[in-house]
Structures are given as C-alpha cells and as structure tokens.
Amino acid sequence: MPSRNDTYDDKALSLPRILCLHGGGTNARIFESQCRVISAHLKPYFRLVFAEAPYESAPGPGVTSVYADYAPFKRWLPWLPEDEHASNEEVVHDIDQAIEEAIMSDDKKGASGPWVALLGFSQGAKLVMSLLIRQDVRRSRHAPPIAGPHWAFGVILAGRAPPVALDAGFFNSTMLCEPSQLDIVRPPDMIDAMSEDHRVRVPTIHMQGLFDQGLHLHREMLEDYCIEGTTRLIEWNAAHVVALKRSDVDVLITHILEVARETGVLRD
C-alpha cells in the first residue's frame, strides 16, 4: 500500500514540510490514517511526513479495533521493564536516527521544501516538546545546534507532561524525565521549577480533549513547559483521539496557518 507521501504531485515536493510523530502503540502508517483529514486541509500549504518510532510495542488502547492489520506497532520511549538494558544515550541516539531516516527518506523521494514544524500525538507530542526544548536551550545559550532542521513551531495533540531530557550532557533539569522513563521519579527541584530554561520558546499549538483521562497532564505541559505568550490552546469535546470531524479540524488548521504566517514559514 503506497504511503500518502508518495501520492503528492510535483508541486508538493517543494512545499514546507512538517514532521509528524505518532503515538505509542501505533506506527507511522496508522498516524497517516489518523491524520487524513488534517493532511487534506494542509495539503495546499505543507507536505506532511510521518516518522516511525524505533521500538516495537504492544498496540495502544483501541488500536486493534481499527488497525489490527497494521502491525508492527511502535513506541518512541523504551519504558517497559524488559527495556532496562537501553541507556539514556542509546535511546536518544535511536530517536534521532528514526527522525533522520524519515527526513532522508523523504529527501530521496525528491522533496526539497524546508523542514519547518513538528506535529505529534500523545507520546509523539511528548517527544515534539522534548525536541523543541533541546533546540531552544541550545539556541538561548548560543551553543552549537543539534544537526538537522530548525523547527519554527510545534503542534501538540494530547501531549502529556513531562517532556524528556534529550540533551542531558549539555542541559538537564529535574523538570524533565529521563528517556527511559515516562514520568519524573522524584519531586522537581524548586529552583528548576521556577526557571524558564526547560520551557519551549517557539510557538506551540495545543489541542486537548476535555474527556481525555490525561487532560491534567496536557494542561501541565502547556502551563509548565512553554514560555507565556507563545501558546495557542484548543479545547474540544473528545477523549484521547486525533480530530476527524471537519468542524474540529478547521479550528486546528486555522491556528496552524496563522502561526505559520507569524513565524514567516508561509507568506501571503
């Protein structure tokens, strides 16, 4: 079955590109399907590229009811007991390699547009925030950037706090969890909590379902991990899902296009 990325016409090859990171217990192919309405609305403006997480996983809740034939299922973070052999450095390497493979694969298809943004759902959204923190900390300290694109903004769909420390050798904070964990194992240091070093500085759009069991963690992600004045919030009547109804998607698309123009990614 061809990827949606293979069906773009030649004009789309030069469009700005958004890298999309799927949730835990799914995979890139499933996330393409989950984002089909979002993709259709963004197609005139962006090329969406879907990365595949590095670690195999059991299917996420409800995944097999629709996508049972889409195995193997993947996850970005090796937090299960059987994954204890993976060091934090190895996890970061595996994540970076998976992202690099998605970028190189799309380049080989002839795509030439700039990489401009990250979009993630659930565990993928946690990773989007983690990547943006790594980028912003290095930039704010005038340090050499990590090799790869500069991300102008992020789209956070049901992203649970806390983000992950992807650059512990350069910057670490008790507000961030280790790559081999899903949560912080001890209370954060008060000085770290009051600092803005762990907060994302580029614009982010947060879409949060009001019936999602993780809503309090989604709100924490926005309130505790973003610089004030850089965020946009969409609350909608849904659980832990990607928006499919046009009325819900339209709101998200409006925010994405507005932020893209504000950051200079798109020009009228």
Swiss-Prot record:
Disruption phenotype: Completely abolishes the production of pestalotiollide B. Belongs to the LovG family. GO terms for biological process: secondary metabolite biosynthetic process. It comes from Pestalotiopsis microspora. It is an enzyme of class 3 (hydrolase). This is Esterase GME11355. The active site is at residues 122, 212, 240. Its EC number is 3.1.2.-. Induction: The expression of the dibenzodioxocinones biosynthesis cluster is positively regulated by the transcription factor dibT. GO terms for molecular function: hydrolase activity.
